[in-house]
Design a protein with these regions (language model features):
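N-terminal, positively charged/glycine-rich alpha-helical extensions of SAM-dependent methyltransferases
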Residues: 1-16, 29
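Conserved alpha-helix/loop element of class I SAM-dependent methyltransferases that forms part
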Residues: 22-46
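A short acidic, Gly/Pro-enriched loop at the edge of an enzyme's catalytic core
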Residues: 114-125
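A short SAM/SAH-binding and catalytic strip from SAM-dependent methyltransferases
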Residues: 123-137
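Class I SAM-dependent methyltransferase SAM/SAH-binding core
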Residues: 48-116
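Conserved Class I S-adenosyl-L-methionine
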Residues: 20, 56-58, 119, 178, ...
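Conserved catalytic/acceptor-binding region of the Class I
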Residues: 149-210, 221-230
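A short glycine-rich, Lys/Arg-flanked "PGG" loop and its adjoining helix->strand segment in the class I
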Residues: 138-153
Length: 267
């Protein structure tokens, strides 16, 4: 996993990500609903929140306005993402307001979440659409439970093996996505899993070039290094249309979100 290349691709896409990342936004909204549903419904129990892989801040904004925590630490691999989240309005209505202003203290910390130490005593460690980029999820889970207070919550989404299967089947390139059962097993070594589920979402596009444009503008081509020659692009588009066209002539791109909510076992 080339983390440098991943960071570079997402940094370049930060100005277009929010417009293009329709599925990721839907996933973030559902994640928040599930967190409340499976942790007792008390939005105000989460005083200290850490989000790793915050990106441009779409999920961060949901966390801020729904939970209204005292502190929100935002982390991302890309230092450039700080400019995307620095003006998030706080729960009190102003950017990065402190507790005395009735708002949330919002801080940003750049770095690889697989290597960073987050604050101990955290109530909620959470992320959307990030963990699929990790080199060693098992090691992260083994470390992350130490950052949570007893009974603290780990809540995240990732993607499963059917994610963007169209691209992988045609190019032979893609991430090695873990299936739901494997993700649940890894988490259960250190947490009590309260909720684990998956869904498959099929997005329609006018044509294969529109699919490639979508991927570029969201930055999710982070591991792809190939050069598109005219001949290779033409062959890709023809194969994509032949294999993945709908009756109405549009083509599809599949997303496979996985949702996990777990409680810290440590006492």
């Amino acid at each position: 996993m080339d983390k440098r290349l991943i960071a570079e691709r997402f940094a370049k896409a930060r100005g277009t990500y929010d417009r293009e990342a329709r599925v990721q936004q839907q996933v973030a909204e559902r994640m928040m609903r599930l967190v409340l549903q499976h942790t007792g419904g008390d939005a105000f129990r989460f005083r200290n929140v850490v989000e790793f892989g915050c990106g441009t801040g779409s999920y961060s904004s949901i966390l801020l306005h729904t939970l209204k925590p005292e502190t929100l630490l935002l982390n991302d691999l890309c230092p450039e993402m700080e400019e995307c989240v620095e003006n998030l309005p706080s729960a009190g209505g102003s950017p990065q307001a402190g507790p005395s202003a009735g708002g949330t203290v919002v801080r940003f910390r750049a770095g690889d979440a697989e290597e960073l130490d987050f604050p101990t005593g955290t109530d909620l460690l959470t992320s959307c659409s990030t963990l699929q980029w990790f080199t060693d999820p098992a090691a992260f889970f083994a470390r992350s439970h130490r950052f949570l207070k007893p009974g603290g919550i780990l809540a995240f989404t990732t993607f499963g093996p059917s994610n963007m299967h169209e691209i992988r089947s045609l190019t032979g390139h893609g991430l090695d996505y873990l299936p739901l059962d494997e993700v649940r097993r890894l988490v259960a070594s250190h947490f009590d899993v309260r909720y684990a589920a998956e869904e498959v979402v099929s997005l329609p596009f006018a044509d294969p070039p529109s699919v490639l444009r979508h991927l570029k503008l969201t930055g999710v081509t982070g591991t792809e290094k190939r050069m598109w020659t005219r001949g290779r692009l033409q062959a890709f588009c023809e194969d994509y249309t032949r294999r993945f066209a709908r009756p109405d002539g549009k083509v599809t791109l599949t997303y496979h979100p996985i949702y996990i909510i777990a409680q810290n076992k440590s006492l």
